[in-house]
């Protein structure tokens, strides 16, 4: 179910997040998250995960809630310094054939 441009979407969004975190433009939701701190961002990730669980159970709004969760996770990754590249590296490490066969937490 992969398609051309999927990575581009995540990279484009992550680039926008990095820009907003650096410039902190007035009215930016991303900038307001950063100003409230890591604790707030971490709570938002938990809140969005819970909303995605409910959506999955009801079958309503799954894509929208998944998008909200991914956005907040990307903000958290940017703020912690792990970044999108760190996430990609960890996912690659977990894939079968990654040298040690992965750690059983991936595909």
Regions found by a protein language model. Name each.
Residues 1-66, 70-107:
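Flexible "arm" and connector segments at domain edges
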